[in-house]
Amino acid sequence: MKKIVLLRHGESAWNKENRFTGWTDVDLTEKGIAEACKAGELLKENGFNFDKAYTSYLKRAVKTLNCVLDRMDQDWIPVEKSWRLNEKHYGDLQGLNKSETAAKYGDEQVLIWRRSYDIAPNALSEDDPRNPRFENRYQEVPDAELPRTESLKDTIERIMPYWKCIIFPNLKTADEILVVAHGNSLRGIIKHLKHISDEEIVKLNLPTAVPYVFEFSDELNLEKDYFLGDPEEIRKLMEAVANQGKKK
């Protein structure tokens, strides 16, 4: 039996403030650190021993991974970071409060911007200081590949080459792999693994720092998937995520 665990990062400062974050490199809150530590303890209690871990270039995911591995006493395992695992780029929405934006444009429009499969928010201009081409961490990425905005479809197209060529093939030699990333980048992986339709994927709400386990046969066929934790608590957390983009 082979396993891949997908984990969304713990609560970030802009999660707490209900802002569109995207590629903005905000830190974890104290609650987010505690969530990450709890996830690590839960994984350890359930006997997970990872062979390798993957994460994005954004500190909220990197620090979540560090907390998890520390609590599991597995700090030594190989870790690979990739910009391809970054969150969906929210264009010029980045930094705006979701509820205030919903009050201005309506819940339906904000839901489209947040979760539509193929509609992206307005793009950042080339001279916008938030444009990733100005950041040192992306210097080795061709400028044409760096997004100024993304739909979920765009995000999945960015992630899938890395998933198909790097992460998933490693399951041939590894027994357990951990991927710590973001709500939309993980949504893309889940859509691929479970063959979820474009229409249904927008309804999937991933809570912060709740391990999502995928079990595969030795032939790498998906056999089972489940969240680790109390089902009722997880349901409430999912509901809270769904309500983030609604006006108050």
UniProtKB/Swiss-Prot annotation:
**Site feature: Transition state stabilizer:** 182
Q: Which GO terms describe its molecular function?
A: phosphoglycerate mutase activity
Its top-level enzyme class, in one word, is isomerase
Enzyme Commission number(s) from the entry: 5.4.2.11
Pathway per its UniProt entry is:
Carbohydrate degradation; glycolysis; pyruvate from D-glyceraldehyde 3-phosphate: step 3/5
Q: Where do the catalytic residues lie?
A: 9, 87
> Which chemical reaction does it catalyze?
(2R)-2-phosphoglycerate = (2R)-3-phosphoglycerate
Q: Which UniProt keywords apply?
A: Gluconeogenesis, Glycolysis, Isomerase
Q: Which residues bind substrate?
A: 8-15, 21-22, 60, 87-90, 98, 114-115, 183-184
Q: Which PROSITE patterns match?
A: PG_MUTASE
What highest taxon heads this organism's lineage? Bacteria
GO terms, biological process: gluconeogenesis; glycolytic process
Q: What does this protein do?
A: Catalyzes the interconversion of 2-phosphoglycerate and 3-phosphoglycerate.
What family name appears in the similarity comment?
Answer: Belongs to the phosphoglycerate mutase family. BPG-dependent PGAM subfamily.
| The protein, known as | 2,3-bisphosphoglycerate-dependent phosphoglycerate mutase
Source species of the chain: Bacteroides fragilis (strain ATCC 25285 / DSM 2151 / CCUG 4856 / JCM 11019 / LMG 10263 / NCTC 9343 / Onslow / VPI 2553 / EN-2)
